Amino acid sequence: MDPRKQYEGHLKDYPLTNYPDYEPGHPPRSERLEKIGFLDEVEKIWGSRWGGSGGIGRLREVALIKPTEHEVDPLWEKDRNFFLLRRVRVDIDRLKQAFEDYAQVLESLGVRVRWMEAPQSWGAYGPMRKLFMGAFPLVIKGGAIVSRQGQASFMRGVEVNFTKFFASINCPILHTIHGHGICEVGVFVPIAEDVIMGFKSCASNDDGLEQVLSVFKRSEVKEMPVAHSTTIIDDFEAGGEFHVDMVLGVVDIRKVVVYPGYLDYNIYRWFKDREFQIIEVPKDEHHKFYPANLVLIEPGKVIMAKGATETIRRVRAAGVEVIELDTTGLMAGTNGIRCVTLPLVRDPGPGLD
């Protein structure tokens, strides 16, 4: 019973028997409270069960962040390599329109879109870039894990905006990565109910993974395989991808899209040992469209980059419905669909058992 939603009487008439530690005429029987878990109470206290990335069930709610003129400040052009501007100069009008188009697609599919503000644009070392990126924190069963960035110093500080946002929507923060931990946990990939793929790279170290795993255990995550991602040193063309969601996407239960050029062998074996169908992304489509960076609406239904025609053909041949989205505007901001998306609520979905 949720008393806030179901009780309609006067306060003075509220039945004391609704308190689980109540015994007439005695102090609270506190030992009874030890049997009640956080997840048993989260919706009653916070108003929602939360959990956008704990599994692959039907997506119900996301947050997006509208890009602003801040993203085209001349400062970023002083050194494009340092500011990770791999492609053409950011076109703010195309980027804004891409967000509007994406939001319309989500809403047409029954997904609620919350628009998040990013008022803090200065971080630990100066102005921050990529403030419209939603996939830094992770929302699992019960609440959010707030990330600590490792890809670049100009991202150190975005967690303030996310912390304020979670407070504004009554989403509890379960943990903030701290100490010497680094973990851009929002790009972890849910594989099935209570199975989430982590990764190690410049964007996720051992300390960060250890912190995340301790939270996962209390939020009913049963397994966290860890991919070893590639890196960038001097040249974007020679480098790889430091986020696992750039090379791996789930399209259905036991069906994944991967770019094998940046997928480590242990993860390949992990999928094969569990009888996953692996759909390969062609090299040219990976570098042009990042088709593995997709958004799962529900098992067997995904949003993918429109230009990746061969990957889409292969995904459809595997029995998956694909909604195509023109991502050229997003790509002008050097990002894929999933990079800008913060899933907040999903239905329970299928597991691997």
Each model region followed by its residue ranges:
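The feature marks the mature, well-folded catalytic cores of soluble enzymes
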Residues: 1-353
